[in-house]
């Protein structure tokens, strides 16, 4: 079922919040839906047919080859000042074919939307792709982050908010255990006669302890993001969570 969602993006150093109202279907049957993108001007730009562009294309070729089999890869190409660092991550429950399909869409889209930027990121429901001229591996990305939520309100926001935070906190612990190499977890929680479904995930360049800090940070943004909303997400360049009142992901 199509539902009205709202995206709230917080760019670094922004004075005003940019709010975009969109109609979109973010259901289990549309895993490859485009979510958002950002092209960074901070790191400057490159020219067509330059060494930086060549290194960027090589990076994307490597990610396209490496990621589908494992769901994640991070790589660097070239030497300073034309080196490019990048990663790609597929949702933890995505099949290899779904992962590949998402990357085949996301990478050309990112190149088209950020044609000459030395840094950029794109999010789809099933994957994210990110590149930069600076080495960001192992660090929490505080710059790239946005909210997405259902505009419908729940009948008992106080209880719902508390149970949502409890579920996401529980999933964070599950995702950051020593044996969870995917840094990914899903689960469900009963709220009266209804069920709440949740997902958390980090990019795998982070250590478990850093992943936990990233997830705890965005879970702390629940009141600003999704207070009393039937569904919501905080999506960043290093970690994300999502919750819904319908089963958007397998939990077993």
Swiss-Prot record:
Signal peptide boundaries: 1-27
Subcellular location: Secreted
InterPro entries referenced in this protein's UniProt entry, alphabetically: CRR_secretory_protein (IPR050581), GNK2 (IPR002902), GNK2_sf (IPR038408)
Gene3D superfamilies, sorted: Gnk2 domain, C-X8-C-X2-C motif
First-listed, main subcellular location of the protein, grouped into a coarse class: secreted
Consequence of substituting residue 147 to S: In strain: cv. Bla-1 and cv. Bu-0
Keywords: Repeat, Secreted, Signal
Domain annotation Gnk2-homologous: ranges: 34-136, 142-248
GO annotations of cellular component type: cytosol; extracellular region; plant-type vacuole; secretory vesicle
CDD domains in UniProt: Gnk2-like (cd23509)
BP terms from Gene Ontology: response to abscisic acid
Pfam families from the UniProt entry: Stress-antifung
UniProt cross-references to PANTHER family, sorted A to Z: CYSTEINE-RICH REPEAT SECRETORY PROTEIN 38, CYSTEINE-RICH REPEAT SECRETORY PROTEIN 38-RELATED
Family per similarity comment: Belongs to the cysteine-rich repeat secretory protein family.
Protein name according to UniProt: Cysteine-rich repeat secretory protein 38
Lineage: Eukaryota, Viridiplantae, Streptophyta, Embryophyta, Tracheophyta
Gene this protein is translated from: CRRSP38
């Amino acid at each position: 079922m199509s539902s009205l969602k709202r995206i709230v993006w917080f760019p670094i150093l922004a004075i005003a919040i940019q709010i975009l109202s969109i109609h979109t279907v973010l259901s289990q049957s549309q895993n490859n839906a485009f979510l958002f993108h950002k092209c960074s001007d901070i790191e400057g730009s490159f020219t067509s047919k330059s060494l930086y562009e060549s290194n960027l294309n090589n990076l994307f070729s490597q990610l396209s080859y490496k990621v589908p089999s494992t769901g994640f890869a991070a790589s660097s190409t070239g030497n300073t000042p034309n080196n490019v660092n990048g990663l790609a991550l597929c949702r933890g429950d995505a099949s290899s074919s779904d992962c590949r399909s998402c990357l085949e869409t996301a990478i050309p889209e990112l190149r088209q939307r950020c044609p000459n930027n030395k840094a950029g990121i794109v999010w789809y429901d099933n994957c994210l792709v990110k590149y930069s001229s600076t080495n960001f591996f192992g660090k929490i990305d505080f710059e790239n982050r946005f909210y997405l939520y259902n505009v419908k309100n729940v009948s008992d926001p106080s209880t719902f908010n508390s149970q949502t935070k409890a579920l996401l906190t529980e999933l964070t612990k599950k995702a950051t255990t020593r044996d969870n190499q995917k840094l990914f977890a899903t689960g469900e929680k009963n709220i009266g006669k209804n069920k709440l479904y949740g997902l958390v995930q980090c990019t795998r360049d982070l250590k478990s302890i850093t992943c936990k800090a990233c997830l705890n940070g965005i879970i702390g943004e629940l009141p600003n993001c999704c207070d009393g909303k039937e569904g919501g997400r905080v999506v960043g360049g290093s970690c994300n969570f999502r919750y819904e009142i319908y089963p958007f992901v397998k939990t077993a």
